[in-house]
Regions:
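Acidic, histidine-bearing metal-coordination/catalytic regions of metal-dependent phosphoesterases
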Residues: 80-184, 191, 195-204, 325, ...
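Short, composition-biased motifs enriched in small/polar/acidic residues
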Residues: 484-559
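Surface-exposed, short loops/turns at beta-strand junctions within beta-sandwich domains
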Residues: 47-49, 137-145, 544-549
Length: 559
């Protein structure tokens, strides 16, 4: 059977997918108990029109030799209202947040909230009858956990211990950021990436959650968003604000300003979460702790330096005083994955028009997707040409950025500092991988592997981790700010039972001694606690009764 309401298909059972006609057979025979089995479906009331509605059914035999045919149906109304999407959170700031949800029929909107699950003492209410509910909570306390419920007067449609959010902190704190690029496949690949992060971050809450575009394949329809985002992350959406950007696939199901993305999400247009007002959902900025986030639209907005988007971005960056600046958009300025930044207009224009502005205002990290791979650059500045134009001078640090190898990337400035280098990451493998040459000269590492990006910001330290879908860490690096010189071992001495290490240091910077009993040096553990430097050279020593000749020592920068 196939059911239609007002000419729109609403249900299909035991019929093949795709177009059918009077000659299409049912998939299997129905016999015995199956002949009296009823199926219950829930009808979306938004499909009902005022006045007369038409419910039609077409019933198909399983073969041309069948001689009996029966069908029965009933339609009944219920007073039960159900949430069909969400709730989900938008516009999180120190003092406010937006709670959204969708109901299967029009109701008033009510959010109750408070500091404990048993005392939701505050509320916001809107008497308009709507199915798309969007309620702004204000006058909240920074860095505070609130529980909430959603519904309408007299009815709670959703509440419980996992209905909560934490407002952004007023002061600096350790911040965990999770970024997903091109994740919207709604398949096992996306699920494995999701689950790997859940295991990796178990016990460590996510503070900022980013999606880098192509969030719902293949056309960014409302139904595809339901499967790839809302059904994929229902728990996380209830207590984490989701910050998104527009990918090319977001635009395939609508015209310039009417694709579903713009109706599903409510990013800050009027500086509700910091930064300057953009006046549009397509690009915006926000602050969290000591990080300023800049979201640009690389798909539908004017990418020229004098266009509305970059005029706003320059003013926004000029007003930014945060310690860190992270920009994100969909089309990467450098890639040789499933897309090529030497060939595609959006990628070329973001590199040639946008990067000079961002680097002039001291951007630290740029995240994008589009290429279904993972690529991570060196610490770069001033590279705005094609891949064959790469010169050594554009690499401010040609090392790995790993403390245990060539050392972290260092930037002497505190806060936005022009042309001290940025790292560019393509993290477009959160839902699929598509290969490519993976040989762009700007990149230190290029991987055709599924995964997501985890960032941990702690004061003047930013640590990045590429986490595979199988839980393995396949890349990591660190950026340190306020550092004018690299850590150099100035003396290392083993004499009898004494180990002595001295190194160049900067007053106020924290170090640790780590040791390894592995001759390959691939398993390290902290041997000391924090050692805070008070001068330009710091030393440490210890005595050992029986020193292992294969033991290794190293000095690492903590922050």
């Amino acid at each position: 059977v196939i059911l239609y309401l007002n000419g729109v298909e609403i249900y299909r059972n035991n019929m093949p997918a795709g177009l059918v006609d009077s000659h299409t057979f049912a998939v299997t025979n129905v016999f015995g108990a199956g002949e009296s089995t009823f199926y219950s479906i829930k009808l979306d009331t938004s499909l009902l029109a005022p006045g007369i509605n038409f419910l039609a059914a077409e019933v198909h035999q399983a073969g041309s030799d069948s001689i009996d045919l029966s069908f029965d149906a009933s339609l009944s109304a219920s007073n039960v209202v159900l949430i069909t999407r969400g709730p989900y959170l938008q516009q999180g700031s120190e003092t406010g947040i937006v709670v959204r949800w969708r109901s299967d029929r029009g109701t008033e909107s009510l959010v109750k909230y408070g500091a404990s699950l048993d005392n939701l003492a505050f509320s916001v209410h809107d008497s308009a009858l709507v199915t798309e509910h969007e309620m702004a909570l204000s006058n909240l306390l920074p860095g505070t956990k609130y529980y909430y419920s959603v519904g309408f007067p007299g009815f709670d449609l959703g509440s419980g211990p996992d209905y909560y959010f934490v407002t952004a902190p007023a002061t600096n704190k350790t911040t965990r950021i999770w970024a997903l690029g091109d994740c919207g496949t709604a398949n096992g690949d996306e699920q494995r990436v999701r689950d790997a992060y859940a295991n990796f971050s178990s016990g460590r809450p996510t503070d900022v959650w980013l999606m880098l575009g192509d969030n719902a394949y293949s056309s960014g329809t409302d139904l595809e968003y339901q499967g790839a985002v809302f059904n994929m992350f229902p728990d996380m959406l209830r207590h984490n604000v989701l910050w998104t950007t527009i990918g090319n696939h977001e635009t395939y199901s609508g015209i310039f300003d009417e694709f579903p993305y713009l109706h599903i999400f409510s990013p800050p247009r009027n500086a509700e979460a910091g930064g300057l007002p953009s006046g549009t959902k397509k690009y915006y900025s926000f602050n969290y702790a000591n990080v300023h986030f800049l979201c640009l639209d690389s798909m539908t907005s004017d990418r020229s330096p004098s266009g509305a988007m970059m005029t706003w971005a320059q003013a926004d960056l000029a007003a930014n005083t945060n310690l860190w600046t992270i920009a994100f958009w969909h089309h990467p300025p450098y890639t040789k994955g499933s897309h090529d930044s030497d060939l595609e207009q959006e990628l070329i224009e973001m590199r040639t028009n946008v990067l000079p502005i961002l680097e002039n205002y001291g951007v630290d990290l740029v995240l994008s997707g589009h290429s279904h791979c993972y690529e991570r650059s060196y610490l770069l500045d001033g590279f705005y040409g094609y891949s064959w134009d790469m010169k050594p001078a554009y690499k401010l640090d040609a090392g790995s950025g790993r403390p245990e190898e060539s050392g972290p990337y260092i930037k002497s400035g505190i806060g936005p500092s022009a042309h001290q280098g940025a790292v560019y990451i393509v993290a477009g493998s959160s839902g699929q991988i598509s290969g490519g040459q993976l040989n762009h000269p700007a990149m230190f590492v290029s991987l055709n592997e599924l995964g997501s990006l985890v960032l941990d910001v702690n004061g003047t330290s930013l640590q990045a981790t590429f986490l595979r879908d199988n839980g393995l860490v396949r890349d990591h690096f660190t950026i340190l700010k306020g550092i004018t010189q690299r850590l150099r071992i100035s003396e290392f001495n083993i004499e009898d039972e004494l180990v002595f290490i001295a190194w160049t240091s900067k007053p106020g910077v924290t170090y640790r001694i780590q040791s390894s009993s592995s001759t390959t040096g691939n398993v390290w553990s902290d041997y000391t606690g924090n050692i805070t430097a008070t001068g330009n050279e710091t030393s440490w020593y210890d005595f050992f009764d029986d020193l292992d000749p294969d033991r290794l020592f190293r000095v690492v920068v903590i922050q």
